[in-house]
Amino acid sequence: MPESNREDGVHEGNAAVTQLYGEPFDSGLALAEQHQLAADLTAACAVYEQLLTLAESVEDSPDVQFLRAHLLANIASVRLTATDLVAAEDAVERSRALLDGIASAPMGPRGRQLWLEMTLRTLLARADLLRRTGRLDEALACLDEAALRLPEFDDPEGLRTSELGLNRVHLLIERGEWGAAEELASALLSTTPATAVETIPRLLIALGLICASTGRFDPAEDYFARAEDALRATGDTGELQSLLAHRAYTAMLRGDFDLAEQLFAEASAFFERQRQYGDLAVCEQARAFLAGRRGDSTGADDLTAASLSRFEQLGASIAAADTMLLGAQHAYDRGDITEMQRLAQKARDVYQAREVHERCAQVDLMLARTIEDNLNRTDHGDHERTSVDNALSLALPAALALEAARYGFATAHARSQWLELADDAMRLVFRLAVRRQDQGLLFELVEHRCAGASLALDRTPSAPPPSPDGDAAASGETGESVSVFPSAAMKVYGHVDDPTTLGGVAADAAAAAGLRVAPPPKVRMSQDSGRVALQEYIAAAEFRYHRRIVDEEEVPFWITDDLTSRPVVQVRLADAGDLFITWTWAGGARGFGTGHGPAEEVDRAVRALAAALPGPGAAAEGIRQAFASGAMTDPRTEHALARELAEAVWPEGLTAQIRQVSARAGRPLVRIQPSPRVAQVPWELLAVDAESDGRLIDLADVVTTAPTSLRRPDPGPYQRPALDAGVHRDPAASPDTDTDTVVLVLDPRIPGFRADSPLGSVLGPPGSDPELLAFVQSRLDAGAVVPSVATPAEAFRRTDLDRDWLSGALRKGARRLMYVGHVSGAPVEGGQSEDGTLHLCCGPGTAGLAETVRTHRPLSAKDLLLGTLPLRADGEPGARIWPAPPRVALIGCESGGDLRFAESFGLAMAMLHNGAELVTATRWVLPTSFAFHRLAGLPESVRPLSAAVVAVDNAHEDQDPVGRLGRWQREQLDHWRSDGRIEHSPLLWAAMTCIVV
């Protein structure tokens, strides 16, 4: 057996002749490798076959058998690249048999290492082969066997470790486990040595495919560009052409069909010349889809038939089924329903047999869409209800599975991008429910949609202790996902009950990336019947597609036990194309209802609101525009906006019910859980009366409610149970409140920022505002205040209020926390509400999860939730470090912007998660009193922001904080309607809202 070691991957050695077996074998191996680099696979295979023939003529011995195994492994590699899967399988099996035959032969330490290396290569090649032919369980078993062999192999640079990890990434992609694949690939990329010149570009390509397949096209192109640079550096012509096909696939998903057609045609020509028929079949499949889009039915059918034939010849059963599904769509487009059903069922049978459950969901969604399309085209008469029922029985379980796929992603950004793809299926479901006029189903759909994801602290990896052997090759955690039809030869697969394990390095990367979430709890619709929202559809989805849709834990859709003192209506809104609304009454009133606002009207009204508010750019410029031209600064334009919003998002029937209840039982409380699209709507301001200037706040008190997932019967050891009816209770009556302390964080001085800078003072010089000084003095007179101050002025612009101080103050116990200062909201398009931050006196050396800003590290919602779990092996969750008191006020720019996100884990929700019962926060960027003075010409003696701070403080001291704040807001509204003075503009006071669970 040869006694020198080398990396035998095609690109991870070099083309120079390496002394291994002697001539002519060494020079022949170098020549074949050159052919492979040049993508001349036929020539490379011919050289290997000649060498194998020569080796078989040499007298048999363990060394000769090893040489033959080496040559067969190389032949298998070339055949795999050429997608000659039958010949590749034969070569792999023969190589493995030869290696097994000499396993017990005497060999020195170096010989044993060479045998192990060749065995690993053969196992990885076999796993690749099994994956390509759809035998995914066998492929995983093969990788597991390789992992068992790996510790014995001397791999100081981690080349084989990274190669094994790459194969796991490919298998996760094949299964559609996009989240787990992304985690593992990212972790591998950060740990793979630069000498792994073959593995690195393939990892980059894998990450690009993951991003493209989940709707993140710019990051995908960035990964592809980096991969291209690496491939050009090694001269890998063949892989560059494969990259071209991946870019074509991305262009197709992005909707750039002309570019996709051009790139696929170029790649197809190359693959056909090189006889890489599997890659050619993938291109033909995609080109068939493109031909169908441009109306070339003949071309689409021809390309589909060619792709299907090639996949079947190669034994790529799942890819063949994908092409059948595409053919089924073409058959439907030309009116051949029988052929559509035949092909769809045949594809589904393959997916079912291979346990590719998510692809089964894609078939079911396609069938449901065809039923809806047929309903739109033809009159089903008496059979329409049956047709709609059939479509719903297919679409709703599949849509639930598709939506639930997001829980495998490690970041909220990736999950939000995935939801943009998955929402199309849920919009279909809502359309069908409306068509069936099923108010009960619509109610349950909205309840499930509004339940919200659950924070999965138990899945948040903590920083691992140093490991001597590392774990870069460990597989990613389960995160099944599905591809959106049609996706060229992208197969999906998943086992809910068989998660792989996230290794230490991958765990660390995941913790740095973002929050982990889990499915929402079951929403119990009735205490008496025990019915769970969508229970039969959830059961069908979990049975058909083997995916967890909801958590085992149940929560009531609304806790009404303590709501007997006044009538209360819970309103929830959900986005599904149109805006869907449900409401139900309690507290002495009974009834429920549903409604919906057409998407165009809602979008138009929301755009008008956005134009009236401070813009998304620099805060100063946005506020300047709001004062100069915004509708909120003139009573007439403000009323027109409030009326437009009411007509678009508020049901007239609900207004009528509120009037009836109010006349009979007194002012009701309206609890509103908005959808992300309408989360900035100032509900109090809605002009609900077409004949007068009556507003919703004239009829009722209004409070915002958090997603149901925050309402858990057993919140665990990290937080105090949140009390749903806390808006009616005296904080002193809470059994968990054992202190009278009020924690005040008032305009803290931020390191590195002067008073007149972007993160400078929001309240002005300490001691300059008599109203604020009087407010602090009243708190000092009433009881304990933290920080301890001798005079009210000392409470402002302090430099010692950092996160450690805040932790100590909150751990000692408090009944209230009031923060007035800078808040930086997370960009909605990023999808990560947990990136919202408040600004304390923390310097750059402070440990935390937010990036530093100059010489300052902000405190993020992610910090408040995860605490130090991602930073230390002995880390604590945020609820232990910063336990929130019952009432919290966060008066800063868009501090309550959480609900604008699909996953609400911003500052306000973090406080509720950490134990708060009520959080007062703001819906949009707040103008300071200084802004009113400079931009609106208000006298310096009038300080609107100070008045708002005092109003919130008074409300939090009241037994009914929502009612007290509402009275102040009605007073402001009355002034606004009577005199129209800018200090009474809703631009400030309508931003305030109380949020409860």
Give the positions of each predicted feature:
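Flexible helix-coil transition and linker loops at the boundaries of alpha-helical arrays
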Residues: 15-19, 54-65, 98-117, 149-159, ...
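Eukaryotic all-alpha helical interaction scaffolds
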Residues: 35, 55, 59, 99, ...
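Active-site-proximal C-terminal subdomain of hydrolase catalytic domains
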Residues: 420, 433-437, 886-997
